[in-house]
Regions:
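Alpha-helical junction/boundary sensor with strong preference for TPR arrays
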Residues: 117, 124, 184, 217, ...
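Start-of-helix register in tetratricopeptide repeats
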Residues: 129, 192, 228-229, 263, ...
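Amphipathic helix-loop-helix modules that constitute alpha-helical solenoid scaffolds
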Residues: 1-37, 46-218
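Alpha-helical residues within the helix-turn-helix
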Residues: 42-44
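TPR/TPR-like (Sel1-like) alpha-helical repeat modules
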Residues: 278-296
Length: 307
């Protein structure tokens, strides 16, 4: 049995080739992992209403076409794997907003995502992207305790105390990343894990290799372009080449795609602030503040806006 866990089997079932590939991951998130249309829409940068309609249409087509939901054979797993990895990552990402670990459901979802990644790693040990995903989740989870101060305030990565990071998770992540690299088949999750690995080095060296991070984001946007990667690349290049360079990269992103993407406005606001463009920075901060439901992040952005 290639897939020993029932939830993993159901995830692969949702990636049936007769189903619209764009709906594979959303269906997994809703039907197997229990996310609602709001959380799924947030992950895919669309409104909850639009995502709900897409899910409803997909289910209607499944019923009308009488698609048989069967466990895939071992030789069918590779072509369904990417959607499953995306679903596990999106499930973990939906828990990331609960930085303080106060929401039991969010904590449970993060734990389940990491557990599923470990089970999948054991089931497909020679697939480097599975190990890359696990390494990425472990690196992120290692920093969760440092994302909130004792008073509940939001602490950005650059200001976190690395001594609070969970060393056992970082060590496990590094082992997974090393094994994945030995396969010499680079993929999106391995690059993202490598970026987090560079950040984790600060716990050992006291510094962050910003040029390396910028280079990895260059690779990521070429291999797996996305709005999130493009915004993060702009922020990374700003750290190396200055705010103007970062802003130029932000300006290359399609404006329509980032209208409701909060990280874009937060990065843009900070870069404009560094360039002493006070009015434009204030407007961007206001957009970023209006797009977050997290009180701690809102307070953090308000404080930045007042600088």
């Amino acid at each position: 049995d290639a897939l020993p866990d029932e939830r993993l089997k159901l995830l692969f079932v949702c990636a049936h080739p007769a189903i619209d590939p764009a709906m594979h991951t959303p269906l997994m998130l809703q039907t197997v992992l229990g996310l609602d249309a709001v959380a799924i829409g947030r992950a895919f940068l669309v409104s909850p209403t639009a995502m709900g309609q897409r899910l409803a249409r997909a289910k209607t087509k499944i019923r009308q076409a009488r698609i048989a939901f069967e466990i895939p054979a071992a030789d069918q797993i590779p072509q369904r794997l990417e959607a499953v990895l995306n679903a596990i990552y999106a499930a973990y990402g939906s828990s990331w907003e609960d930085a303080g670990g106060r929401d039991e459901r969010a904590v449970g979802l993060a734990e389940e995502a990491i557990w599923l990644a470990r089970v999948l790693r054991d089931a497909i040990p020679d697939e480097p992207e599975v190990r890359g995903l696990l390494a990425l989740l472990l690196h992120c989870e290692a920093r969760r305790p440092a994302r909130r101060g004792a008073d509940g305030r939001f602490v950005p990565l650059s200001e976190q105390d690395p001594h609070i990071w969970l060393a056992p998770l970082i060590d496990e992540a590094e082992r997974e990343l090393a094994v994945s690299a030995a396969h010499a088949r680079l993929g999106r999750f391995q690059i993202e894990a490598a970026i987090q690995s560079v950040h984790a080095e600060r716990a050992r060296t006291g510094r962050t290799d910003r040029p390396a991070i910028a280079t990895f984001y260059d690779q990521l946007t070429r291999l797996a372009p996305s709005i999130g990667a493009a915004v993060a690349r702009a922020a990374a290049h700003a750290e190396v080449h200055g705010a103007q360079a970062g802003l130029a990269l932000l300006d290359q992103i399609d404006a329509h795609s980032v209208v409701s993407y909060q990280p874009y406005w937060a990065v843009r606001a900070d870069l404009l602030r560094q360039l002493n463009c006070a009015h434009e920075a204030a407007e961007a901060f206001d957009r970023a503040i209006g797009l977050t439901d997290d009180d701690a992040i809102r307070a953090f952005l308000l404080e930045r806006r007042r600088r």
